[in-house]
Amino acid sequence: MNIVDQQTFRDAMSCMGAAVNIITTDGPAGRAGFTASAVCSVTDTPPTLLVCLNRGASVWPVFNENRTLCVNTLSAGQEPLSNLFGGKTPMEHRFAAARWQTGVTGCPQLEKALVSFDCRISQVVSVGTHDILFCAIEAIHRHATPYGLVWFDRSYHALMRPAC
């Protein structure tokens, strides 16, 4: 039996490129946000995506109580914002670093994100240290920027949308 240790798993996962997202919420438990690359599509009928959130994260209780979130997929050039939301910076300073609109769920939408998915959490499944949040998409807001941002091999990389 081959047992995969934590470092081997993390090293292997660094080979999988992923979009960089800031996940936000606002509601009775307050306003919070964090950076995540563990986000993916589940189904288009009904439109659903998933977000993985460590139950030990300081933001977990806020998302758990609010039950709404917005997945803001970042554009190239927004790396400093990703770093800010990925650290221990106080929430008010994180949100003060960018311009936001309010989505239909009441969650903050980043004005210059590549795309924003405004969602209600429809189901939560716990696996190991994380909760997998299944998110029913209520609204999508796409932005005109031609540059995406991915996390690959432990660093940021810009992607350019092909010219039509």
Curated annotation (Swiss-Prot):
Job of this protein: Catalyzes the reduction of FMN to FMNH2 which is used to reduce pyrimidine by RutA via the Rut pathway.
Record's note on what induces expression: Up-regulated by the nitrogen regulatory protein C (NtrC also called GlnG) and repressed by RutR.
Keywords, in A-Z order: Flavoprotein, FMN, NAD, Oxidoreductase
Keyword Flavoprotein: yes
EC code(s) of this entry: 1.5.1.42
Name this polypeptide is given: FMN reductase (NADH) RutF
GO MF assignments: FMN binding; FMN reductase (NADH) activity; FMN reductase [NAD(P)H] activity; riboflavin reductase (NADPH) activity
Any one Gene Ontology BP term: uracil catabolic process
Catalysed transformations (reactions): FMNH2 + NAD(+) = FMN + NADH + 2 H(+)
Family: Belongs to the non-flavoprotein flavin reductase family. RutF subfamily.
Organism field: Escherichia coli O150:H5 (strain SE15)
Taxonomic classification: Bacteria, Pseudomonadati, Pseudomonadota, Gammaproteobacteria, Enterobacterales
Domain of life where this protein originates: Bacteria
PANTHER family: FLAVIN REDUCTASE, FMN REDUCTASE (NADH) RUTF
InterPro entries: Flavin_Rdtase-like_dom (IPR002563), NADH-dep_flavin_reductase (IPR050268), RutF (IPR019917), Split_barrel_FMN-bd (IPR012349)
Keyword Oxidoreductase: yes
